[in-house]
C-alpha cells in the first residue's frame, strides 16, 4: 500500500485554539457555591496526604494513565497507513494505557497493522443487539473484530446527532453488560459554562450513567468541555482540575468511595503536544481523550509520554 506524505491532521477544518485560558467557571446558585466551597477546602486539606501515599505516579485514579485518540470522521486508506506507521515507530512510556478510535470503515485495516501496544476502540455503538438499524454499529460487531473499548456520550453525538443523557446511559449499560469498556464523555457547552451551569450539566450526565450502568469497573470518564473545542478558548490546567475534583467527589457521594478512588477521569478539551505536560501535572487528571492531535503520530506520542510530568519521587 502506498504511503502518503500528507498529514492526516491537515484534513481537519475549523478555527485553531488560542493559547490564553478562558475563565468562565461560575456556580449556578448560592447552594452550589456553599457546597463546592466546602468541597474544595476539604480536598485541598487532604491533598498532601493523598500525594504522600502514591510513590510512582501522582494520580487520583488507581489505574494506569490513560490516553485515547479519537480519529473521528477523518482519513483515507493511505493517510491512515501513514499514521499507523508513525505510531508503530513511536517510543511510548510503558505505564500508560493507549487506545485509538479509527473510523469504523478502517478498523480492520488498523487492527492488521497497528502494534499490539495500542488497543483499538469503536467511536460509537448501538443501544441494543444489532438488527434493522441503518447506519449503526452493534456491540456484538465490535466484539467480533476484537475491539475492547467504545466511546459513548461524545459531545458530537450529544449536540450534533441529538443523543440525550438517558439514551447514552442505556448504550453504556448495554456495552458494559456485553463486555466492552466504555469511555464515558461528559462536558458543558460554552453557554452553559457562562451561565454558571458547568457542575450541574456534568452531574446530570454522570447521573444518567450511574442510573443505568451495572458497574463502574470498566468505565473511564472523559471530561470534555465543549467550549474548549474549536472556540479559541482553552481550559487552563487549574480549570480542568477543578472539574475533575468535583466529578470525583460526585462519584464518592453518589456511587461509592471505592468507585471514586478507582475511576480514571481523563481530560478532552483541545489537548496537544504543547499543553499536555502541564495538564498531566494536575493530580485528578488521569489521562487524555485527544482529537485533532491524535491524527499526528509524533504529537500523539508526546501526549502519551506526558505521563512523565506526573511522576514523583518515591
Curated annotation (Swiss-Prot):
Polar residues: compositionally biased ranges: 1-22
Substrates-to-products reaction catalysed: D-glyceraldehyde 3-phosphate = dihydroxyacetone phosphate
Binding-site positions, substrate: 70, 72
Class in the EC hierarchy, top level: isomerase
One Pfam family linked to the record: TIM
Annotated segments matching region Disordered: 1-25
Entry-linked InterPro entries: Aldolase_TIM, TIM_sf, TrioseP_Isoase_bac/euk, Triosephosphate_isomerase, Triosephosphate_isomerase_AS
Keyword Transmembrane helix: no
Pathway given in the UniProt record: Carbohydrate biosynthesis; Calvin cycle
Cellular component per GO, a single term: chloroplast
Bilayer-crossing regions: none
Any one GO MF annotation of this record: triose-phosphate isomerase activity
Gene Ontology BP, a term: glycerol catabolic process
The protein's Enzyme Commission number: 5.3.1.1
Main location: plastid
Membership in a protein family: Belongs to the triosephosphate isomerase family.
Quaternary assembly: Homodimer.
Listed HAMAP family: TIM_B
Protein name per UniProt: Triosephosphate isomerase, chloroplastic
Amino acid at each position: 500500500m502506498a504511503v502518503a506524505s500528507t498529514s492526516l491532521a491537515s484534513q481537519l477544518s475549523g478555527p485553531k485554539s488560542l493559547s490564553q485560558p478562558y475563565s468562565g467557571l461560575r456556580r449556578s446558585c448560592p447552594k452550589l457555591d456553599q457546597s463546592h466551597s466546602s468541597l474544595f477546602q476539604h480536598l485541598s486539606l487532604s491533598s498532601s496526604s493523598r500525594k504522600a501515599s502514591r510513590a510512582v505516579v501522582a494520580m487520583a485514579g488507581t489505574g494506569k494513565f490513560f490516553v485515547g485518540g479519537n480519529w473521528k470522521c477523518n482519513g483515507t486508506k493511505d493517510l491512515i497507513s501513514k499514521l499507523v506507521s508513525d505510531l508503530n515507530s513511536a517510543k511510548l512510556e510503558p505505564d500508560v494505557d493507549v487506545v485509538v478510535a479509527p473510523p469504523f470503515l478502517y478498523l480492520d485495516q488498523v487492527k492488521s497493522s497497528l502494534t499490539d501496544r495500542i488497543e483499538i476502540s469503536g467511536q460509537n455503538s448501538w443501544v441494543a443487539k444489532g438488527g434493522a438499524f441503518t447506519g449503526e454499529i452493534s456491540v456484538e460487531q465490535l466484539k467480533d473484530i476484537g475491539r475492547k473499548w467504545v466511546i459513548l456520550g461524545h459531545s458530537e453525538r450529544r449536540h450534533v446527532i441529538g443523543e440525550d443523557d438517558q439514551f447514552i446511559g442505556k448504550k453504556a449499560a448495554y456495552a458494559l453488560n456485553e463486555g466492552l469498556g466504555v469511555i464515558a464523555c461528559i462536558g458543558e457547552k460554552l453557554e452553559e459554562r457562562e451561565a454558571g451551569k458547568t457542575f450541574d450539566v456534568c452531574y446530570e450526565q454522570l447521573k444518567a450513567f450511574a442510573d443505568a450502568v451495572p458497574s463502574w469497573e470498566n468505565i473511564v470518564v472523559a471530561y470534555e468541555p465543549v467550549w474548549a473545542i474549536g472556540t479559541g478558548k482553552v481550559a487552563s490546567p487549574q480549570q480542568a482540575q477543578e472539574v475533575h475534583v468535583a466529578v470525583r467527589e460526585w462519584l464518592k457521594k453518589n456511587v461509592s468511595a471505592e468507585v471514586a478512588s478507582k475511576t480514571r477521569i481523563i481530560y478532552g478539551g483541545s489537548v496537544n503536544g504543547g499543553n499536555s505536560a502541564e495538564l498531566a501535572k494536575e493530580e485528578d487528571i488521569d489521562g487524555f481523550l485527544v482529537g485533532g492531535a491524535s491524527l499526528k503520530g509524533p504529537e500523539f506520542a508526546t501526549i502519551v509520554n506526558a505521563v512523565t510530568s506526573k511522576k514523583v519521587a518515591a
